[in-house]
Design a protein with these regions (language model features):
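Transition segments tied to proteolytic processing and entry into folded domains
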Residues: 1-211
Length: 211
């Protein structure tokens, strides 16, 4: 069956990326990891522009899979890099070094169209991305011109404080709703006890007023 992963909204990818770079792959090298069981590939990208994070001239990203001698390992949903590829990559820091955030959802191909415009679109992937709340497959993001893509990244960065605040407000409302529900449940479960207590209070008040 197909490999299924949770679809990640664009703004969430921007929020969680340690860096976002545009650049060209200038070198790839695959080798066994320290355990000697798994192949990892190191791809060096000459950075043209950092859309988010520290401006660097080069970044080397590590991804699982690759080829060492006659041994080949690959994982569905993990992007591969080849010399000459032009990419936008969302970065995540790991103990092995930077990797691609959300794997195939964090890497984009950059190609030049017939009019000479650079177009950014998600890398091809065999994985199916699902909206887990609605339980439906999500279509890939539409191709965008490079300026449009950069604008979307900057808009997401700029809107983050507002979105965080809105999320906090929604969470407080949810907690209040739960609290109100708990109080209502308490009254529903204990209405006999509450009724007896109310009768007791009324009798006590009646006794006081008689004196």
């Amino acid at each position: 069956g197909a490999t299924v992963s949770q679809a990640v909204p664009f703004e969430e990818k921007v929020d969680n990326a340690a860096g976002i770079v545009l650049g060209k792959v200038v070198d790839t090298k695959s080798q066994m990891d320290a355990s000697g069981r798994w192949i990892v590939t190191y791809s060096t990208i000459r950075v043209e522009k950092a859309m988010k994070g520290q401006a660097v001239s080069e970044v080397t990203v590590v991804t699982p899979g690759g080829r060492v001698g006659t041994l080949n390992q690959s994982t569905i949903g993990v992007p591969s890099f080849h010399e000459g590829d032009e990419r936008v990559v969302f970065l995540k820091n790991t103990r092995l070094g930077p990797t691609v955030l959300y794997f195939d959802q964090g890497a984009y191909d950059v190609a030049t169209d017939s009019r000479g415009e650079r177009i950014v679109e998600p890398v091809q992937s065999d994985a199916v991305h699902m909206d887990t709340q609605r339980g439906v497959a999500v279509a890939n993001e539409e191709p965008r011109t490079l300026p449009e893509f950069e604008k979307a990244v900057q808009a997401a960065i700029k809107s983050r404080p507002q979105r965080v605040e809105m999320s906090a407000v929604a969470e407080r409302a949810r907690q209040q709703q739960q609290k109100n529900g708990t109080i209502a449940d308490f009254f529903a479960r204990n209405k006999v006890v509450i009724a007896i207590a109310a009768i007791g209070a009324a009798l006590a008040l009646w006794q006081l007023t008689r004196k």
